[in-house]
């Protein structure tokens, strides 16, 4: 929760999540809210968090006004039609770890670790100032701020993908999205493209195509990286020999996902 708006993600049974959506839509303020729904076999979150923050996603530029200057929405079907037009530039506003495993074909990417790093790359983006900008992110939240930032810095024609990558995959089959979509829950990556799917990321150990993220089994390292299943067992889920020899290395169970100590999922 922040002054600029709300953003939330929940996980539950079909009945539970439907009751949640019905309850929100019963409030006139949320009657037209669009929910992005993914079906999964397991609960995606281990614990509930409600936070009040200065920004929904930290950007660090105080004067950006998402209510006045956010880019125009492009519905997924429209995006598919115009993304390859001349003088059009597709820009990915996600972190490097996200676009490493999946991105739109020919998209401009930024070497950022956090969304708040975007303003540092304004100089690089200036070369596209007179182009038609098509911005995208996972679900559309970050693009509200990123497109407003571009417009406030003189970019004239700025659009962003309504509903983000996830909605694009549902409504268009995900055509021309290479790889998988990174998500910030226990799933880590999800399939998007059922039309012309590819794998663009590679195992850090052997170099074979893989989109399988794990955390290093050495708790002190905990590096988040791509490791194929075979190399996972060979390296015991570690990113280096030093981590594999570490006395406090966690037992690798084939998933590379380790719950925080003292945390228990409640279903």
Enumerate the language-model features and the residues they cover.
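Structural scaffold elements adjacent to functional motifs in cytosolic proteins
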Residues: 90-92
């Amino acid at each position: 929760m922040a002054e600029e708006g709300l953003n939330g993600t929940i996980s539950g049974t079909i009945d539970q999540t439907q009751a949640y959506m019905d309850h929100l839509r019963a409030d006139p303020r949320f009657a037209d809210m669009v929910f992005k729904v993914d079906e999964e076999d397991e609960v995606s979150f281990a614990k509930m968090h409600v936070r009040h923050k200065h920004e929904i996603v930290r950007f660090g530029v105080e004067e950006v006004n998402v209510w006045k200057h956010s880019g125009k929405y492009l519905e997924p079907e429209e995006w598919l039609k115009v993304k390859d037009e001349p003088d059009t530039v597709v820009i990915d506003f996600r972190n490097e770890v996200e676009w490493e495993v999946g991105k739109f074909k020919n998209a401009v990417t930024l070497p950022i670790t956090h969304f708040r790093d975007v303003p540092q790359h304004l100089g690089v983006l200036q070369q596209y100032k007179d182009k038609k900008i098509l911005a995208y992110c996972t679900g559309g939240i970050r693009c509200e701020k990123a497109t407003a930032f571009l417009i406030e810095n003189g970019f004239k024609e700025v659009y962003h993908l309504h509903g983000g990558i996830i909605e694009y995959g549902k409504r268009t089959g995900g055509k021309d999205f290479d790889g998988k979509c990174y998500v910030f829950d226990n799933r880590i990556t999800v399939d998007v493209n059922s039309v012309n799917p590819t794998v663009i990321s590679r195992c850090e150990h052997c170099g074979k195509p893989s989109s399988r993220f794990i955390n290093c089994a050495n708790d002190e390292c905990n590096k988040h990286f791509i490791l194929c299943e075979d190399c996972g067992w060979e390296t015991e889920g570690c990113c280096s020999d030093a981590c594999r020899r570490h006395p406090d290395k966690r037992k690798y169970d084939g998933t590379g996902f380790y719950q925080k100590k003292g945390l228990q999922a409640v279903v």
